[in-house]
Amino acid sequence: MDLRHNGRNNEYVTNQRSLCSPKSVNYKMSAKKFRHITVTAVVIANMVGTGVFTSLGFQLLDIRSGFVLLMLWAVGGLAALCGAMTYAELGAAMPRSGGEYNFLTRIYHPAAGFVSGWVSVTIGFAGPVALAAMTFAAYATTVMPGEPSAILEKSLAAGLLIILTCVHATNRRNSGAIQLIFTILKVAVIVLFCIAAIVLVDSPQPVNFFPSEGDGALLTSGEFAVALIYVSYAYAGWNAATYLSSELEEPQRTLPWILMTGTLVVMTLYVALNFVFLYAASMDSMAGELEVGYIAAEVAFGDVGGRFTGIVLAMLLVSTVSAMTMAGPRVIQVIGEDFPTIGVLGRKNKDGIPANAIILQSSIAMLFILSSTFESILVFAGFTLALNSFATVLGIFILRWKQPDLERPYRTFLYPLPPLIYLTLTGWTLWFVLLSRPVEGLFGLGIIGSGLLLYFFSSFKAANTT
């Protein structure tokens, strides 16, 4: 497919039209816009959630160095920031909703974009939505009387998903306002939690947060690389603004700053929060546990304070489910607009909301909640999302080579260092996940392969009906 860019109005036109390839359209911006502060809130809320409140427990199974554990979050933040700087250039040059689907379609081939969208539909957002809802339920049940029940946890997770699906599928104003309020509360609570825990903990844990003997070997070990997949999942969402580009005010100007500001805020919060977890609670008490935030709060604030904090953290996870229910369906919507055979997914209601896409994503997330385990979703979702963003960041080199004259309102600062750093760290992590967790890695590759098969099957079917 030949994509030609009209530099005056950032429209792209194609010279190819078929029932299964992207339609020959001018990609127009949505008339109704989200404010940049709302989209920044989406970026922050997409990141701050399931991963940071659960990952430390898994990391402590293999790593017991305070310095190395904090370096995990710093390195993961560096990778996310480099990715955000790269996506900022791509998003400013190609300001259409859809994220990786939009970028990979234009840089590589419609098949690459379709597979990216397929990943987003099956894993990219539905999986994290399910994880966040499951974590909400896990934190909520820890403060309830009696033993936690698997049925109760699944019921709470499913109920939350249903409520937020209805909110986001019906009204744009409520959608943006709720997202902004929850994000402000989330950041405020995390900051207050960190300060209060440091002040109130009577006996800090004897953890060394400075480099010590053996830390150098750990930093280059397979254990560190695999632990980074949990961290990369926790940072997943730094690219959320690109899914709403068409609905953003002045995307060429505001998108780069939204991506980088959101990522820097979250990186600071993550390092501080994990420092406090390790400062307050023993490594043995958190190793292998999901509710590390509740465990640390119980040590710092006592039983009553711990339960209250558990409730607050559970409520904050609502914003994570909300953010992904808001951003993810925009990818599905764009695919529906481009592929007539699934055009029903691209339809919007009278308020300009892709209600059909929201319902589809939430339905898949519901299947995950009812049928899968937390860790299995976490590993293969993290692996597949990292692979998706790896291909997108690599695309900046291809796009600069193929379209050197493309209008770029923002150019990646210190190029080519940010994309090279991101590709190196992410590629290293993906390789070690394949070696140490082959089942989850191969499952992720299988999802990608099935997307390719679906694309070419649809192409063949469309060719025979025209």
Model-derived features: where do they sit?
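Membrane-interface loop-to-helix entry segments
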Residues: 152-204, 259-263, 382-391, 418-421, ...
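Membrane-interface "cap" regions at the ends of multi-pass membrane proteins
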Residues: 11-67, 80-81, 85, 96-97, ...
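Hydrophobic transmembrane alpha-helices that form the core helical bundles
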Residues: 81-161, 166-169, 313-334, 370-387
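TM-loop-TM module centered on a large, flexible mid-protein loop between adjacent transmembrane helices
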Residues: 102-103, 109, 142-147, 213-214, ...
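A generic transmembrane alpha-helix motif of multi-pass inner-membrane proteins
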Residues: 380, 384, 416-466
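C-terminal membrane-solvent junction of multi-pass transporters and transport-like membrane proteins
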Residues: 344-355, 389-440
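Hydrophobic, membrane-embedded alpha-helices of multi-pass small-molecule transporters
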Residues: 35-53, 160, 197, 214-268, ...
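Hydrophobic alpha-helical segments and their helix-loop junctions in multi-pass secondary transporters
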Residues: 184-213, 275-281, 394-406, 434, ...
